[in-house]
Amino acid sequence: MPQTTPYSSKFNPSAYSSSHSHRQPVEENYGGLHYRDNKLVSGSLEALIQLLVPTVDYYPDRSYIFTFLLSSRLFLNPFELMSRVCYLGVDHHRVGDPQMDKKRIRDIAPKIVQLLTEWTETFPYDFRDERMMRSLKEMTHRLAFGDELSRRAMQRLIQRLLRKLTTLGQYEESLATTSAAAAIDRPVALKSKQQLVRRDDCVLNLCDDPFIFAQQLTHIEMERLSYIGPEEFVRAFAQKRPSDNHKSFFSKRKASNLEAYVEWFNRLSYLTATEICMPVKKKHRARVLEFFIDVAQECFNIGNFNSLMAIITGMNMNPVSRLKKTWGKVNTDKFDILVHQMDPSSNFYSYRTALRGATQRSSTAHTSQEMIVIPFFSLFIKDIYFLNEGCANRLSNGHINFEKFWELAKQVSEFLSWRQVICPFERDRKTLQYLISAPVFSEDELQLASYESEGPENNLERDTRRSLRSSLSRM
């Protein structure tokens, strides 16, 4: 049988490059699987499931395991897949002779344990489903019938999994608590602006070192990235298809960590704009503006493109961009370069070039700081979305389009390599707490703060300010 995957030990983009020769590709079929030039390109769901299941003399390629576990949830619930794996891996081959069954289980058990280890370590959130956990425990009992070592390995596997799920639950509770506290403490009207300017936790009073501030942003980014499960990328676009047969499964899940990460980007943008618009005096606003430009530069140097883009987005919001007198006191050369780096023209060509450079640096890194790559996340999601929209999940013959899912897995696996890096910077707890919980202005409050800082320039702006004052004073 041809190799199961176009990659050996990792996902290799060259597997998708076109050949320089003009020969016809070699097409082959094996039991419901279709190969082109020795690469799996499509197959029936049942054949792909069977390819996942180890036998005594076969174990699937790791990149195939990842790709199929990632994409299969578009076609069947993970619990259904687990049931099929249990049946095909153990129950299907029982012959009714206790001794022969015990020997076979003993022979296959290490590979079943290995497969379940990869599943629980890469997709632990699948096992928040009680049925999945129950199946895992049942498999432990089945393997114990033939092999004590495998039973112990399964017990250790379950213990590691439970620790991961406990940590996830604590993280989600912490996010919910922080969000609730920020909502309660949030200023509800601009009449409190003067008091907020003088608050002790004003950003420059708290931390006036752009490098340290960028480090703390990187801590938050990397922590939130680390909790995003790879399956969330599939779930994100699966929910957009009303005809999906497993919509009910996807909709049962809580708000995803992916969504929480996108919300963090929005929060940082609004926090940046709030801090710039808040000071009453022009020179103070200019200092804050310069500070955030320097923070953005440090984020770029670190490889934290998500915080960089969030800060630029905040600075480009109308309440900030219209402060011409404030901008006039700032040297914008550095800012202009950063804006160019994140310019959306030519499909973010400049940013993608910088990202490739950061990725290359990470692959040859000598220090943990050089390993950091935090992509502009909204664009990363957009790329996956267009990959999904541009290719069908199934071919006309009913086969699953596995070429599409190789490409999806390649993109998501790169994300996983970025996600696993440990942030090397020292934590500044006060700055971290400020970043995640400091009150921020709403869009209307920002606009009014901007008008109060630098007055309206025309009748339309004067009318807008009057309307905002009236509406916010009633809150």
Curated annotation (Swiss-Prot):
Biological process (GO), any one: Ras protein signal transduction
GO CC aspect terms: plasma membrane
Keyword Cell membrane included in the entry's annotation: no
Gene Ontology MF term list: guanyl-nucleotide exchange factor activity
SUPFAM superfamilies according to UniProt: Ras GEF
Keyword Lipid metabolism: no
Region (Disordered): 1-25, 452-475
Keywords assigned by UniProt, alphabetized: Guanine-nucleotide releasing factor
InterPro entries associated with the record: Ras-like_GEF, Ras-like_Gua-exchang_fac_N, Ras_G-nucl-exch_fac_CS, Ras_GEF_dom_sf, RASGEF_cat_dom, RASGEF_cat_dom_sf
Designated name of the protein: Ras-GEF domain-containing family member 1B-B
